[in-house]
Each structure stands twice: as C-alpha cells, then as structure tokens.
Amino acid sequence: VQIVVETGGSEPQSRLQHQLATMLSSVPRENILVFSDMEEDVGATHIHDGLADISMQERKDYPEFSLYDELQLYQQLGKDTRKLEGGWKLAKYKNMAIKQKIWKMLREANNALPRRKWYVFIDTDTFVEWDNLLSLLESLDPRKNQYIGSPVWANPKAPFAHGGSAIVLSYSALESLNVPEYEGPMPSQFGVNTTALCCGDEALAMALKKRGIGLKGYWPMFNGETPSTVGFGSEIWCEPVLSLHHISGVAMEDLWQWIEDWKA
C-alpha cells in the first residue's frame, strides 16, 4: 500500500507533523508520499510539489495559480508561506496532477518508487485505522479497476469519493487513468474542466468515469465525521471504522493513543 498525503504551503506544518508522529508512525517511510503546492522538507520527510509539472501555458487557464506563484516567491524570499490565504482554491488542481506525478515517478528508470497494489490518498486531517482498512483491501482485487471511498452525491449520475475521508485507487485504476496519455486541452486535469467544479474529488470521479471506472462506496466505514459528530445508531452500529475526518493536533494524538491502548 502506498499512502499519499496531500498538504499545502499555506497550511500549518503542525498538522502533517502530528499525523506523522501518530497514525503514520507505524507506516514504513518508503510507503509514504507527501505532496503540496511547493517543495520543502518537514523534518526528515520530503514534500513533493504536485503542481510543478503543469506547464506555464496551462497555468494561464487557471486563475487560482496566482497563489501558486506567490507561494514560490514567498519561499524564495524566506517569507512565511503560512500567512497566505486561499490554498483550498488551488488544492482542487492538485488532486489529478498528483496522480500524474505518481505515475511519472513509477515510470522513471532511476526512481526507487516501487509499484504498489493500492494507493490511499488522504489529507493531513484524515485519520485512518490501518488494520480495518487493510482487512478490507485484502478482500478486494487490485488487478481490477477499483475506486473506493465515501460517496458524495452532488450529482446523482456521478457520485465522487470524499477526499477528506480517504480515497483508494488500485494500481489498475491508476494505470487506466494515465494510459493512454491524455494529450488534449487541460492535460494536467485529464481534460476535465476542474475550474468549473467544486473540488478535485469531483474532477477525479469524472476523469475515471470517462475511462469506465465508477465509484464503489463504502460509507459509513469511510467517514467524513469526527468521533463526536458520527451519527451513532442501529444502521451503522456494527460497521468498522476505516477513516474519520477533521481530526488534527491534540485530537489526532488522543484518538491514536486511545486506539493503541485499546489494542494493547
């Protein structure tokens, strides 16, 4: 399994630091990739710029990329990029650009990134219970086009997986998304007009649908709630928790420690 964490240059580094120190602490570092909208290092963790490969010509089509340029300038001048606002507007373009970047890294002869059966995409405030997630993935076939998560029904004809609850792609689905290489307009977005959509999660679902890959929903196991807002009741009482959202800082530490103590 390859864990792919998405963060941003205007996002507090403490969120990633807490995640690395808790729920990601048991994951081998070679199984963790972190992407942002600028390249930097957080401790021993290297963060890749997920937008770096988007051409200057294509960037002109996306008004939000003025923030990307500002982030790079702040970094070059040694200024605090965390003081910039609006990172969520730029984030929608990272979703699919990251999938292309990973595929490129897998294809590079001199790159040590190994092929994995599964790719799990999370935010820095996503909490994942690894034992439960791995149990689910062991029952599924990574050789098939698998697109898994918690459905958002903004468009009844094309539900998309909620990114904050974690999105899982099989290697086969990642390959189908990237092969054959898309060469039309908006290439970093696989031809999807991401600007007109709510988020990169929706754009990803549209790109996958064009390739005949639909979402397999696993709500409430993939869940966008916190422990205090989950709607406990008879319909979900015996469902295992795979993920939760909006958990960071002390809350991330407390939940992780509680689970570790319970397992012990």
Predicted regions and their residues:
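Eukaryotic short linear interaction motifs
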Residues: 11-13, 40-43, 127-129, 155-159, ...
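Active-site-proximal specificity loops/subdomain of glycosyltransferases
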Residues: 37-116
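Conserved catalytic core of nucleotide-sugar-dependent glycosyltransferases
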Residues: 108, 117-118, 126-206, 210, ...
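C-terminal catalytic/acceptor-binding lobe
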Residues: 195-264
